[in-house]
């Protein structure tokens, strides 16, 4: 009888021990268990920022939840080994892939960012840019942060591909940053995506001190002439002409620019309203969910918890600041050759980063601090949407040289 009880208790004890070892909780006591705990805390913090403070909630929310899922031990939703070396290992993919591995193919193959650009194009009004083509120059000047940070990151020991991925943070364009990084340095995708969207949310905090430091009260109070009306023909021709010119001169930028202008042409032509509304709403929302979850899934403890991530965060904010300064300084330079009454308020130069429409709103707010009756929003939207085009072109340039 005693032997029977002993064997029975041993069986129960062994069963409980085996069950405990098979749970995810046991994974927290493994070699990198502390890293999983740390990343789960980061995920909770990002969820807090997205929900409580509304920091880029549409993407930061899903990125944070993807980060949470991938760092739960033994969940087996995402496997970094399937994408090692920047390639999809199809020979072992089907047998080992989890849910997020399949969804990540949309990032790896460059599908999700391009689909988001279709939606962005359908929601973008290029009218202020068409009415004032000089805005193209301000949008281009704001991309200086991308290339200067690329050089700085390379000098600090990052590979050229990694440096290019870090530099693109300065464009303040999340989908472009994700697209370029997935092509050049997929191992940095998590930190770069978090940095890009965090700094986009912090536009009203980062930009104003730089704008005030580089301008005088008199410059901030400049009133600009009213923009001319833009005809429907101009609005229809613009996306077609831009697509042809950029795709011919820089083929590597064709996917992003082509999708951006496709969406805009849907909006402006007026004959495919159903398609335009679909890409603005249903398609955009679905892709944002998949993109955020899978980008967050790449933020594993091994990829995120290192000094390289800290360097990315620091270089990212420097890139963003340099882009802001570049636009403001070019506007001041252009004023040296502008007649009185036709000068540019330098504050709109900071909107050349492609955080639409937040950067343009910051220009408006800062301008009204000096002159409450000064309305810069529509003027700032020109450089702002030019920055969307500019960041895509910058990504194409980096991809053509580093890809």
Question: What residues fall within each predicted segment?
Answer:
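Short, strongly hydrophobic alpha-helical membrane anchors
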Residues: 1-32
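Hydrophobic transmembrane alpha-helices of secondary-active transporters
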Residues: 46, 69, 104-130, 263-266, ...
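Interfacial helix-loop-helix linkers and transmembrane-helix boundary segments
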Residues: 51-60, 78-79, 102-103, 123-138, ...
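Alpha-helical membrane segments and immediately flanking helix-loop junctions
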Residues: 108-109, 117-123, 138-148, 152, ...
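Entry/N-cap segments of selected transmembrane alpha helices
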Residues: 129-150, 301-328, 380-384
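Alpha-helical transmembrane segments
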Residues: 187-205, 313-323, 346-351
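Membrane-embedded hairpin module used as a gating/binding unit in multi-pass transport
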Residues: 198-271
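Transmembrane helical segments that form the transport core of multi-pass membrane transport proteins
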Residues: 243-331
């Amino acid at each position: 009888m005693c032997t029977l009880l002993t064997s029975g208790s041993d069986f129960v004890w062994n069963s409980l021990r085996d069950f405990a070892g098979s749970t995810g909780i046991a994974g927290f006591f493994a070699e990198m268990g502390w890293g999983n705990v740390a990343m789960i805390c980061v995920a909770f913090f990002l969820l807090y920022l997205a929900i409580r403070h509304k920091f880029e909630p549409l993407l930061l929310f899903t990125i944070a939840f993807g980060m949470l899922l991938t760092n739960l031990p033994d969940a087996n939703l995402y496997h970094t080994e399937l994408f090692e070396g920047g390639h999809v290992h199809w020979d072992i993919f089907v047998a080992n892939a989890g849910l997020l591995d399949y969804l990540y193919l949309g990032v790896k193959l460059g599908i999700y960012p391009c689909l988001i650009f279709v939606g962005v194009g359908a929601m973008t009004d290029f009218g202020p840019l068409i009415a004032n083509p000089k805005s193209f120059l301000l949008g281009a000047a704001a991309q200086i942060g991308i290339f200067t940070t690329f050089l700085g990151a390379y000098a600090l020991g990052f590979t050229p591909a990694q440096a290019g991925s870090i530099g693109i943070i300065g464009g303040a364009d999340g989908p472009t940053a994700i697209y370029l990084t997935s092509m050049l340095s997929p191992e940095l995708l998590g930190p770069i995506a978090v940095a890009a969207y965090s700094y986009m949310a912090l536009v009203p905090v980062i930009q104003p001190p730089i704008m005030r430091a580089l301008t005088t009260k008199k410059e901030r109070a400049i009133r600009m002439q009213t923009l001319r009306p833009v005809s429907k023909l101009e609005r229809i021709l613009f996306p077609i002409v831009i697509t042809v010119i950029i795709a011919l001169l820089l083929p590597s930028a064709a996917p992003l620019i082509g999708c951006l202008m496709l969406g805009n042409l849907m909006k402006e032509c007026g004959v495919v309203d159903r398609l335009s509304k679909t890409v603005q709403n249903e398609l955009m929302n679905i892709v944002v969910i998949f993109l955020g979850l899978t980008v967050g899934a790449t933020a594993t403890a091994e990829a995120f918890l290192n000094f390289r991530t800290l360097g990315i965060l620091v270089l990212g904010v420097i890139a963003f600041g340099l882009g802001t300064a570049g636009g403001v300084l070019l506007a001041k330079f252009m004023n040296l050759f502008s007649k009185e009454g036709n000068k540019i308020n330098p504050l709109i130069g900071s909107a050349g980063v492609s955080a639409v429409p937040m950067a343009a709103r910051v220009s408006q707010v800062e301008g009204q601090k000096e002159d409450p009756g000064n309305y810069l929003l529509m003027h700032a939207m020109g450089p702002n949407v030019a920055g969307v085009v500019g960041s895509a072109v910058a990504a194409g340039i980096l991809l053509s040289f580093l890809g």
